Amino acid sequence: MSEKEEAPSTSKSTGAPSRPTLSLPPRPFSEMFFNGGVGFSPGPMTLVSNMFPDSDEFRSFSQLLAGAMSSPATAAAAAAAATASDYQRLGEGTNSSSGDVDPRFKQNRPTGLMISQSQSPSMFTVPPGLSPAMLLDSPSFLGLFSPVQGSYGMTHQQALAQVTAQAVQANANMQPQTEYPPPSQVQSFSSGQAQIPTSAPLPAQRETSDVTIIEHRSQQPLNVDKPADDGYNWRKYGQKQVKGSEFPRSYYKCTNPGCPVKKKVERSLDGQVTEIIYKGQHNHEPPQNTKRGNKDNTANINGSSINNNRGSSELGASQFQTNSSNKTKREQHEAVSQATTTEHLSEASDGEEVGNGETDVREKDENEPDPKRRSTEVRISEPAPAASHRTVTEPRIIVQTTSEVDLLDDGYRWRKYGQKVVKGNPYPRSYYKCTTPGCGVRKHVERAATDPKAVVTTYEGKHNHDLPAAKSSSHAAAAAQLRPDNRPGGLANLNQQQQQQPVARLRLKEEQTT
């Protein structure tokens, strides 16, 4: 009874009203044993609970919640008075009436949970060793704080909110920062309200950068199947897969009615146009360009010319005008080069029609008496990339001999890749290609229409290698074996055999008739 009487006297001396008390069950022996025993390793919850004092002012979360819900006003005044008196008694160093105060009040408190006076009273930090989830699950988590507004200036609800906010902020800091503003800021910028946030100019910078990127991309060359423009309109009517190249050879025809000009486009292994072979001569002027020229290329892509309503439309118009100007320059360049080389072109016939997948598509257009090969080298320039063409006229050698054999031995090795019947000549024309790797020499062999015994061989190009090693040993052996037959004695024996064979046949016939 004396102890119960001392407690109210202490509270009366401090002038604070009485506070509600809860009777706690005694601790079991095992808990006391683990708390005070030697040689045992306590669990994590025991360690956390030992870090906080065991006085009545620092109870479990459920007890604090029950006390706050029962009488918040009374508990607030009592807790404030008790806390002030405890700090005063600890500061004076007196232990006369400190039965309710644990001397481990400040010694066992972890340094990570200490709140500095220089910081804001509503903020605290979580130590690195403890996660917010572990701290919330601890039964003595809110023992550091008063159940109501105390010396720390926050309730346990506010403490929970602070811990949750810090956990969310820590997770947000671990994620990579995005370069785009929140949707709310972008929406406020696009709505055009009077109050614009601080980060509102960021979408405007993004829009300007997008304009610059798109304009730069519009100047880059595109590697498409269509070759560089030469001032004329072409229609693709066939293609063929060439041995040794991943890209097929494309065949084009001029779209102008009555124009017989055709061309072939060959590409290298990397997809670049390496050779354009024209066939025939245009019988019309180059078509006029209907698109806008350089005079209309006055689109301004500055910030003053782009607004929120017409930014995309002006951007599309500027791209169209830029592409038109680049194409106009290329067409002018190609028209000049085409005009200087048209005198080397000859007329073409309509004897060749090539379709997709047909097997009669040959390596070369057959009705081409004087072809013109154009090797292209693509160079990228800074303002507007264009293809600079280099015209190469390969030498042609025509050899006419009288022979019964079409293919004459000239020392090189050839591979036949095509054959075609030419209009006006009943004899077919055969096409051959040099088998040496890297050599582009071709030849076609045909008999003259006026003299069937005359063989006309036309060579195109120049060999870039020496003569291959001829099979002289085999030819010499064959010639040596044939030399005895050429002697007069050999001819006499051959004549005798020829004379005897008809007699034998006559005898067989006579035997069959009898």
From Swiss-Prot:
Stretches the record annotates as Disordered: 1-28, 175-204, 278-394, 464-514
Keyword Transcription: yes
Sequence positions that bind Zn(2+): C434, T436, C439, H463, H465
Residue ranges with Polar residues bias: 185-198, 286-299, 315-326
One Pfam family, short name: WRKY
Name the UniProt record assigns to this protein: Probable WRKY transcription factor 4
Species in which this protein is naturally found: Arabidopsis thaliana
GO biological process, one term: negative regulation of defense response to bacterium
Presence of the UniProt keyword Iron-sulfur in the record: no
Primary site of residence: nucleus
